[in-house]
């Protein structure tokens, strides 16, 4: 079996042509150190803390965006933890999300050309923010480097589920460094995002416009299969049946993400070492996020 088959999808980190991938999901948290420790408790190997910045149009030094991050980088995609660093629009947006609840509030889709995606979204009727060039300093084994991204964002409120964005990675080697890709829990790929919504039909139509991909029926809702990864939009009742341990804090709710792992036994052992509970759900393992990462759950599945 090839690695592409074992991971179930495209054996490539970044998209080509018209492909669109589920690139990463983001936890919004109040305490960056506690959240980083929580990732480690769950068996991930988190990257060092990084403060995000944007180029100054006037040519001065980079300006803080208002957020910083730590990540769990995977062989395919990643999990991000974001925290506030400055009083900026992005920092205030994070505060508003935290007022609802800590947890998943961001989903980023990767494309080969974020500028083209920006034009497509505007043509599809979305109110858009200006295209953003973002960067953050990273350390590599060769020395300091910069991770750079081009990001297309809709105006806040256009996608009520959270910060939905489409981006293009400019520096794959700086972002996906081999030393950060091995995790004690065997995590290999981000595979899915599940969102509870009040009106599945409305949300599915909107996500179809946002992704450029069709929605199909799934248990309790609609699912959009991307070229890598998927987004499921389900009723609160369907979400509750699948995740009875989670109380939905408010709707809409980004409540769970799927992670492909080397083995369920391996991730179960890693969670146990971290003092975290999990339950078997058929061929899956469901584990609530540690409190420092907010409200929600991981759904771990073994690579076939």
Regions flagged by a language model, labelled:
Residues 54-64:
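Short, flexible/disordered intra-domain loops and linkers
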Residues 46-54:
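A short beta-strand-loop structural module common to alpha/beta enzyme folds
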Residues 1-23, 27-47, 63-133, 140-304:
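Glyoxalase I/VOC metalloenzyme domain signal
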């Amino acid at each position: 079996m090839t690695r592409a088959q074992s991971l179930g999808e495209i054996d490539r980190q970044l998209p080509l042509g018209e492909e669109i991938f589920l690139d990463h999901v983001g936890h919004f948290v109040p305490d960056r150190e506690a959240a980083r420790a929580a990732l480690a408790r769950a068996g991930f190997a988190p990257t060092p803390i990084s403060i995000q910045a944007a180029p100054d149009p006037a040519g001065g030094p980079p300006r803080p965006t208002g957020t910083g991050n730590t990540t769990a980088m995977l062989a395919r995609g990643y999990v991000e933890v974001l925290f506030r660093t400055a009083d900026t629009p992005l920092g205030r947006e994070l505060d508003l999300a935290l007022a609802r609840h800590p947890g998943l509030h961001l989903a980023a889709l990767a494309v080969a050309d974020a500028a083209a995606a920006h034009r497509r979204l505007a043509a599809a009727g979305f109110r858009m923010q200006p295209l953003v060039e973002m960067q953050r300093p990273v350390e590599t084994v060769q020395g300091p480097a910069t991770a750079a991204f081009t990001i297309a964002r809709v105006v806040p409120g256009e996608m009520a589920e959270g910060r939905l964005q489409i981006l293009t990675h400019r520096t794959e080697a700086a972002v996906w460094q081999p030393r950060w890709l091995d995790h004690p829990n065997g995590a290999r790929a981000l595979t899915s995002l599940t969102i509870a919504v009040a009106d599945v039909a409305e949300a599915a139509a909107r996500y179809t416009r946002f992704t450029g991909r069709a929605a199909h029926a799934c248990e309790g809702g609609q699912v959009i299969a991307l070229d890598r990864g998927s987004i499921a939009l389900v009723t609160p009742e369907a979400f509750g049946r699948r995740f009875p341990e989670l109380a939905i804090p408010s709707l809409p709710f980004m409540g769970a993400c799927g992670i492909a792992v080397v083995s369920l036994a391996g991730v179960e052992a890693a969670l146990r070492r971290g003092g975290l509970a999990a339950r078997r759900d058929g061929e899956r393992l469901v584990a609530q996020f540690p409190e420092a990462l907010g409200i929600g759950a991981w759904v771990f599945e073994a690579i076939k």
